[in-house]
């Protein structure tokens, strides 16, 4: 910081000397000195390049009020080495849509997650006795959810939350322990907002693409770590969305998945609903107003 200011002062001094040498009259010298002093004030108000901050960028665009993806390094928690390059565009698109209809989702049971949650097109029909809101973003990761939790979920004062997140962390070579820690931070933030708010945490589902065996082992580790934490909290519950889809090797049942062996088809969503129904009943989400 000191070196930066010294360099700045040197630049200003040199500018003044140059102005004095080039002036042909006292009036021009005086004008040049005045200009130099103004420039000095403006330059010293600017931050030096060595300054850094750990605070995340604003979640909204000042001009439109629509939230934009802040960049991987500006997310809280521990992020994977890389992410899907289309996430920023999907993030902006979804937030623009949600901003326009946010008032309609106040008091809803919020389904929070990534593209698997986002793709539940029959969500409202499948839970006719609940007011539900979908806050899934395709390609999202745990630290992305942690970043947008307040604006997308807690600001709605939800009646409950159904969380499914983590497969994109694993798919982008994230460490299961880091992903589990991010998930714990999400849940702790929810508890801090409202200690009585009930949350269903869905286990990360199996996937069968490249490195299937490696992914299966990592997802099992992640699910076990998250479940251990959830069991310590009376207002949190687990929905086992791993074993309802996976065989003994952790390979997803092709009947329930699209051809990418990652995203659910209509049959797969029906299986998820069946698994959720008794957990929702136990958590008494039915207190949410019917739509």
Outline where the language-model segments fall.
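Catalytic His-Asp segment of secreted/periplasmic serine-dependent ester chemistry enzymes
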Residues: 39, 206-291
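Charged, glycine-enriched surface loops/patches
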Residues: 180-202, 219-236
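Oxyanion-hole/transition-state-stabilizing segment in secreted/luminal serine hydrolases
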Residues: 117-133, 142-184, 189, 200, ...
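N-terminal secretory targeting modules
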Residues: 1-111, 117-126, 281-291
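Acidic/histidine-rich helix-loop elements
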Residues: 73-86, 128-144, 171, 261
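Sec-exported extracytoplasmic/periplasmic mature domains
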Residues: 117, 150, 154, 166, ...
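Loop/turn elements at helix/coil->beta-strand transitions in domains of secreted/extracellular proteins
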Residues: 106-108, 130-131, 157-160, 194-198, ...
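Extracytoplasmic/secreted proteins, especially bacterial periplasmic and envelope-associated proteins
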Residues: 111, 140, 144, 148, ...
């Amino acid at each position: 910081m000191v070196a930066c200011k010294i360099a700045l002062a040197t630049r200003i001094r040199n500018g003044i000397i140059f102005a004095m040498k080039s002036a042909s009259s006292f009036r021009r010298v005086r004008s040049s000195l005045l200009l130099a002093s103004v420039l000095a004030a403006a330059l010293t108000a600017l931050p030096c390049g060595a300054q850094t901050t750990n605070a995340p960028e604003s979640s909204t665009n000042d001009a439109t009020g629509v939230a934009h993806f802040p960049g991987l390094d500006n997310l809280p928690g521990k992020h994977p080495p890389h992410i899907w390059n289309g996430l920023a565009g999907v993030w902006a698109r979804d937030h623009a849509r949600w901003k326009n209809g946010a008032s309609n989702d106040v008091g809803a049971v919020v389904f929070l997650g990534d593209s698997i949650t986002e793709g539940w097109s029959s969500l409202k029909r499948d839970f006719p006795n609940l007011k539900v809101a979908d806050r899934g973003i395709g390609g999202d990761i745990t630290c992305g959810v942690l970043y947008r939790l307040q604006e997308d979920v807690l600001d709605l004062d939800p009646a409950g939350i159904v969380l499914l997140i983590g497969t994109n962390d694993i798919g982008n070579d994230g460490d299961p322990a880091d992903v589990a820690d991010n998930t714990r931070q999400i849940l702790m933030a929810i508890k801090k907002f409202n200690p009585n708010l009930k949350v269903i945490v869905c286990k990360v589902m199996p996937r069968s693409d490249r490195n299937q065996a490696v992914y299966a082992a990592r997802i099992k580790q992640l699910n076990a770590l998250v479940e251990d934490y959830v069991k310590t909290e009376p207002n949190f519950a687990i929905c086992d969305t791993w074993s309802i889809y996976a065989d003994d090797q952790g390979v997803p049942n092709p009947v329930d998945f699209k051809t990418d062996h990652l995203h659910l088809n209509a049959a797969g969503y029906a299986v998820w609903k069946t698994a959720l129904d008794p957990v929702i009943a136990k958590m008494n989400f039915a207190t949410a107003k019917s739509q």
